[in-house]
A protein has these predicted regions:
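Functional-site microenvironments in short loops/helix caps that host divalent-cation chemistry
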Residues: 79-188
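A detector for short metal-coordination/catalytic motifs
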Residues: 178-213
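Glutamate identity and glutamate-enriched acidic tracts
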Residues: 12, 29-30, 124, 165, ...
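Glycine-rich loops and low-complexity Gly/Arg-rich segments
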Residues: 10, 43-48, 141-144, 189-192
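Extended beta-strand/loop cores of jelly-roll/beta-sandwich
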Residues: 1-116, 200-215
Length: 215
């Protein structure tokens, strides 16, 4: 592979302060908001939530008592049809709907909360921590890759992945990888890896960002 084609060119960019999701979300999921495990109070897109409220509450009631101290532990995720709840904290589930949609639909949904997809520049900065090395761990592959890549911003970036993360531009920034990719395919672990073509939303993921503006 010609590295000049497989990697984005080196450049200098002014990076604004940002809020960014620690974990990436599957691209075929629309995040509606989050619900408290103790009070059942939902915060987020109430118009979209109203249609699935009964199913969400049924999922939580099936899980157990309202008393958090009575729980042996909340499941990491709960699913019913196209509804998915993910444990977001000790007291909240993130509420999502599994969708068959286009990237433009996802971008529109994110804008409801003031979020968007990162640009290519922002993605590379967030994934690399501002470092210029080829990989997050340096310029050479270790004999055994960790389960997650190191990240100075505390982002959760798994080595094993079904696809890459979406960015604002129509460029693929990674690809499907096993837990221990070969030296040839491991180039897709680089924050600066790129390939042409639209991403497959059924296997891709996305990380919400919001630019912080200081007046």
């Amino acid at each position: 592979t010609d590295l000049t084609q497989a990697l984005s060119p080196q450049r200098e960019v002014a990076m604004p302060p940002m809020l960014v999701a620690t974990k990436a979300t599957p691209a075929n999921e629309e995040i509606l908001g989050r619900i408290s495990l103790t009070t059942r109070i939902f915060k987020g897109n109430h118009m979209r939530y109203a249609a699935i409220r009964a199913q969400v509450l049924h999922l939580l009631d099936r899980q157990g008592s309202l008393d958090p101290f009575a729980q042996s532990g909340w499941a990491a995720s709960l699913t019913s049809g196209n509804i998915k709840l993910r444990l977001a904290s000790a007291h909240h589930y993130q509420v999502s709907i599994v969708k068959s949609w286009q990237k433009a639909d996802l971008i529109k949904s994110l804008s409801f909360f003031g979020f968007r997809l990162p640009t290519q520049d922002q993605y590379e900065y967030l994934q690399s921590g501002g470092r210029q090395s080829l990989f997050a761990f340096g310029n050479t592959l270790p004999p055994q890759l960790p389960r997650y890549l190191p990240n100075p911003f505390g982002l959760t970036i798994p080595v094993e992945r079904a696809g890459g993360e979406l960015i604002a531009e129509d460029i693929q920034k990674s690809t499907a990888l096993p837990a221990q990719p070969s030296a040839k395919t491991a180039l897709a672990l680089s924050p600066f890896y790129q390939s042409e073509g639209a991403a497959d939303l059924t296997v891709a993921s996305y990380r919400r960002v919001a630019t912080v503006t200081v007046n």
